[in-house]
């Protein structure tokens, strides 16, 4: 009466009725006796992956995921005191948040890969399988012939537990080969996706990496992030990692991209499964990203230029092998081309390792910074808040 009397007696009486209705609606819930003595949870399954990553998952990520992060002792983070975290943790989350997920119809598909191209979370991916690889795949694996690669079978794999259900793949598909269906109906496709990710490597084809179709056969080194469903930002970032990911530095402004890209212990950036290398990512202060990115560029450029001078001294020595001299010449021919410099850099490092093993102290010193020898690219990621 005191609170609502000024609004009229009708309003007061409606509040009284609401209170009475609440009291009348109370009913007893009988708790099963078995709840007082529950069975112990089964032991967690062994996790596959790099030992240091698995340890991070068990010791840090899992307690946080079950809302138990406040109980973690400081010792849990000692290995991360400098801010470094293992890459690839997001692949272990398997959140299963989507109500509906894509179902791929192999008969209607033309293999354009546009669905994978627009996917914000890298949860729908194309693979090319040999006959033996297809025979070893789960029985429920769907495949089709591909005119551009007749020696392989084409598979579009979907991860139901990582998909966010945005439906962008359906929107972009030119032949309506994808439909959204209840997640439960696609549960058996998780094994197909996991098999392809773990066992199928990229095949050499005539499809260029700088095309929509060809680029999507490259492993995405940004996957299963915490961005919103259908986020275009992560679609762009994922594509960049498919083109430059093993040799890229990212200076990231504070904003959405630092939240989905750098949440402590749950990095969506990952490493190439063959080389073990992935993007180097760092988050600057909100307003300083341009300077931070420029600093990264100048720093790695200066280190590399000094290394090349030192390698030139070793290669120019009378004691240098003919193989080392030839490898250095090949390296110099491509030193400003990130993609073309890859193999020459590996060959040069191999020759430097031989020289170091033979007692060349200068080569041994150079190899301490060998990660800077190959040509890299430096990227600045930021949103409107930073840019303007």
Model-derived features with residue positions:
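Ferredoxin-type iron-sulfur electron-transfer modules and their immediate structural context
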Residues: 3-163, 170-379, 385-387
């Amino acid at each position: 009466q005191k609170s609502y009397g000024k609004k009229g007696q009708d309003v007061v009486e409606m509040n009284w009725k609401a209170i009475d209705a609440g009291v009348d609606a109370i009913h007893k819930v009988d708790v099963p006796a078995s709840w007082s003595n529950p069975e112990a949870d089964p032991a967690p399954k062994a996790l596959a992956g790099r030992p240091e990553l698995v340890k991070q998952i068990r010791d840090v990520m899992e307690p946080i995921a079950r809302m138990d992060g406040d109980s973690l002792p400081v010792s849990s983070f000692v290995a991360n005191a400098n801010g470094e975290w293992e890459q690839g943790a997001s692949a272990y989350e398997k959140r299963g948040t989507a109500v509906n997920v894509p179902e791929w119809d192999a008969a209607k598909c033309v293999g354009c890969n546009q669905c994978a191209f627009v996917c914000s979370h890298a949860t729908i991916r194309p693979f090319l399988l040999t006959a033996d690889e297809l025979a070893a795949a789960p029985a429920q694996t769907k495949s089709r012939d591909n005119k551009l690669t007749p020696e392989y079978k084409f598979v579009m794999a979907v991860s139901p537990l990582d998909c966010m259900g945005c439906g962008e793949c359906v929107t972009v598909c030119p032949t309506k080969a994808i439909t959204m269906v209840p997640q439960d109906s696609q549960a058996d496709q998780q094994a197909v996706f996991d098999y392809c990710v773990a066992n199928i490597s990229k095949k050499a084809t005539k499809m260029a990496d700088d095309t929509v179709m060809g680029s999507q056969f490259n492993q995405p080194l940004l996957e299963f992030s915490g961005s919103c469903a259908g986020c275009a930002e992560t679609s762009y970032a994922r594509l960049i990692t498919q083109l430059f990911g093993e040799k890229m530095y990212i200076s990231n402004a504070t904003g959405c991209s630092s939240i989905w890209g750098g949440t402590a212990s749950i990095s969506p950036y990952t490493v190439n499964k063959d080389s073990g290398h992935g993007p180097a990512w760092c988050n600057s202060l909100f307003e300083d990203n341009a300077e931070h990115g420029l600093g990264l560029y100048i720093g790695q450029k200066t280190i590399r230029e000094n290394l090349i001078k030192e390698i030139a001294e070793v290669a120019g020595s009378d004691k240098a092998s003919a193989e080392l001299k030839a490898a250095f010449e090949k390296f110099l021919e491509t030193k400003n081309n990130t993609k073309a410099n890859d193999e020459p850099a590996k060959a040069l490092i191999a020759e430097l390792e031989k020289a170091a093993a033979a007692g060349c102290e200068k080569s041994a010193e150079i190899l301490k910074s060998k990660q800077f020898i190959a040509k890299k690219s430096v990227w600045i990621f930021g949103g409107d808040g930073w840019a303007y």
